[in-house]
Amino acid sequence: MLKKSLIWMFTALFLLMFQTFTPAFASTKHVPQAPSAIYKVDTTKKVVALTFDISWGEKMPGPILNVLNTKNIHKATFFLSGPWIMHHQEIAKQIKSMGYEIGSHGYMHKDFSEQTDNWIREQMGKAEHSFKEVLNLKPTLVRTPNGDFDQRVLRLLNQMGYTVIQWNTDSLDWKNPGVEYMVSRVTTRAVPGDIILMHASDSAKQTAAALPQIIDGLRAKGYQFVTVSELISGVESHTRVQ
């Protein structure tokens, strides 16, 4: 009788354990990761990526390229819009010939989250045509106009073969807040693995003046400069889902 009781007790215990752990096993099913944008990478290495958006103008790219060259910065990433490339082909070619990484900044400067899928595909296709015709390349990195996107946009751009790049430190040069302010803002906020946002469009009138001090300040803190692709290659990217 005792033997039968023990058998029933162990059987009931086994069934209870099975019911308890089965949901846990079920929860381990693979769940596709939501698309996301990259703002920085998690690393202890003192590396940062300088990035420059260009959508219009021809006055500021030259001075900024001169600063980068004078300061021996051979690694930076430029995000160029399609129309700008077509209207300023020689400057675009100069950026490429100097060895800087080039990503897409789309075509028309409108918020992607407010547009249809077909509109986005059409715009990115036009931009790709500009890159191919002038620079003979197809970017794999994209920074959306105004940094605007949502989950739908991220998923669509990922399907088109693009990695969406944002920034962790905004220089605010697009506001022209003053050279000293920009230098202080970037050099105090930058952290290892940072992506730093700046502009080489004509509307950013103070960037070229602030850039030498930003470079010197970051170097004084031990930072080295890499491209975005180098930054995100082989390390865990810090992403955010909008």
Predicted regions and their residues:
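Short, mixed-charge, low-aromatic patches
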Residues: 19-25, 46-51, 80-86, 137-144, ...
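Terminal accessory/targeting
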Residues: 1-51, 66-77, 192-242
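Active-site beta->alpha N-cap acidic-glycine motif
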Residues: 29-113, 119, 123-130, 139
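Catalytic domains of cell-wall/extracellular-matrix polysaccharide-remodeling enzymes
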Residues: 63, 94, 110-197, 201-224, ...
